[in-house]
Amino acid sequence: SIFEDSSRRLWVSAFYEGLDLYDRESDSFIHYKRDVSNPNAIGHNRVFTMFEDSKKNIWIGTEGGGLIHMEKGKNGPVFTSYRYNPDDPSSLSSNLINAIYEDSRNNLWIGTWAGLNRFDYQTKTFKAFRKEDGLADNVVYGIIEDKEGNFWVSTNQGISKFDPVNIKVENYNTADGLQAQEFIRGSFLKSKSGEFFFGGVNGFNSFFPQEILSNPNVPPVYITNFWIYNDLMKPGLPNSPLHSNITETEKIVLPYTQNEFSFEFAALNYSQAFKNRYC
């Protein structure tokens, strides 16, 4: 990748060979590579993406070396690495970085192969959001923010609309018109007109986020079947506590001898019912 910072310095990722800074005046390169004897050297040679935040901090996403912060030093750039630590839940969730983004609230977000991470500038720690938090998948390829402050995140299993304040997620897949479930890292763009583009394995999708409407109504949930000791209960059956259909029953009273029971429930939403989530 090639990246130009706010000082018009041109950085070139050699991918396997570290990072190069192009000197426009001398038409030459300054090379930065991993050096185990130098704690201030770049921590990994496989650089995939770079990003400059509003504070002029430059962040480097690597393939296997985590997230790297680059700042000015007396004798050149000083590199600080942030890596995944399985013993520290506040560490970066993966050392494989796909995307780096600063939102409208000046929070730094990192898309990785194991979730979407929010970086805390004060504590130097990370908070990860994953599939269990509602994302379509843990592999996050791209991050774009809309005018409402929501993130549209491309993943390995569709696109997620993520509200970072209230932690609410809406997921979209091929049933909604996506080119495929899987998208491609580095292939996302917000145009000057506000149109979003996400590239995938079977083409690309483009849309204006304000035109993607969701249904805010929460469907009612009903108990549809009821079992006692693996026997399906119906009105009129011996030992059945039901006096009417289970969907019309407001209360069930059981003796202590009928203490092993189970039930089945469903939401009355038949439009893409597979998207129903129960919390």
Model-predicted regions and their roles:
Residues 4-8, 51-55, 102-106, 145-148, ...:
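Residue-level detector of Asp-centered blade-edge/turn motifs that repeat once per structural unit
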Residues 4-12, 17, 58, 65-68, ...:
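Sequence-structural signature of mature extracellular/luminal beta-sheet repeat domains
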Residues 9-12, 57-61, 107-110, 150-153, ...:
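Conserved beta-propeller blade signature
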Residues 15-19, 63-67, 114-117, 157-160, ...:
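Loop/turn residues immediately N-terminal
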Residues 29:
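Pyridoxal 5′-phosphate
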Residues 34-46, 75-77, 84-101, 119, ...:
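Residue-level "micro-hotspots" composed of small/polar
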Residues 54-55, 61-71, 95-122, 148:
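Beta-propeller domains
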